Regions:
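C-terminal capping alpha-helices of c-type cytochrome domains
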Residues: 1-4
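Short, structured secondary-structure elements
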Residues: 6-219
Length: 219
């Protein structure tokens, strides 16, 4: 309580060098000792850091281990015995690539990964934490929209725009399909408003929307 007031509006030259404020640019992958290990340019960055720390890549996982890891990671479910047997029997050099593509095309992929964004959006179909339980009977529409966005590979910029202003976009043809995206703003808490605290309750509701918007999109 006795500390000084932090100066506001003072951004130093050092602050401006923070990595997330830098413009995106092409970077040349670093040279590595084992040129046979990297399969993609990104692998060169990984291997360069391993080399710098005196570490070596582990060997490739066997196919049974690989399909279990990939399936749990991408769709959150174990592979079926038939899936495992088919993958092990597939001797094509494209077997791993085909497996990943199949998992990415699964509807379970969107269900698995949408849940992380739904946490950001503080998604819930009710407001049971208040003394007056309030249900959101159409809340599932926002959940389904997010799942669909992941499964249909909706570009991130469009993903953001539709959740903030999907009803204001000029394309009228897709307006009804975009409306559930506004659940990002609509599914927040709604407080009881009596004659003595209606103004504060409304302010708290707006504060929640601003907080969720800023935390979700601005960090």
């Amino acid at each position: 309580k006795s500390g000084g007031i932090r100066a506001s509006g003072s951004i130093t030259a050092e602050d401006r060098q923070f990595w997330s404020f830098q413009p995106v640019k092409d970077v040349t992958p670093p040279a590595v000792k084992n040129g046979a290990w990297p399969r993609r340019p990104l692998d060169q960055f990984v291997l360069a850091q391993l080399d710098a720390n005196g570490l070596s890549p582990v060997g490739e996982a066997d196919k049974r281990t690989f399909i279990r890891r990939a399936t749990f990671d991408l769709i959150g479910l174990p592979p079926t015995p038939n899936d495992v047997a088919a993958f092990i029997a597939d001797e094509s050099p494209l077997a791993h690539e085909r497996l990943i593509n199949r998992l990415l095309e699964s509807p379970h992929y969107g269900e698995r990964w949408a849940r992380h964004w739904l946490d950001v959006a503080r998604y819930g179909e009710d407001q049971a934490h208040t003394f007056q339980a309030r249900m959101y009977p159409n809340g599932y529409r926002y959940r389904d929209w997010v799942v669909s966005a992941f499964n249909n590979d909706l570009p991130y910029n469009q993903f953001v725009i539709e959740q903030i202003a999907g009803d204001l976009l000029p394309d009228a043809n897709g307006r009804l399909e975009r409306l559930p995206a506004l659940g990002y703003l609509a599914l927040g808490p709604v407080y009881y408003k009596d004659a003595g605290c209606a103004g504060k309750a409304e302010s708290d509701e707006v504060d929640d929307r601003i907080d969720t918007l800023c935390r979700g999109f601005l960090g």
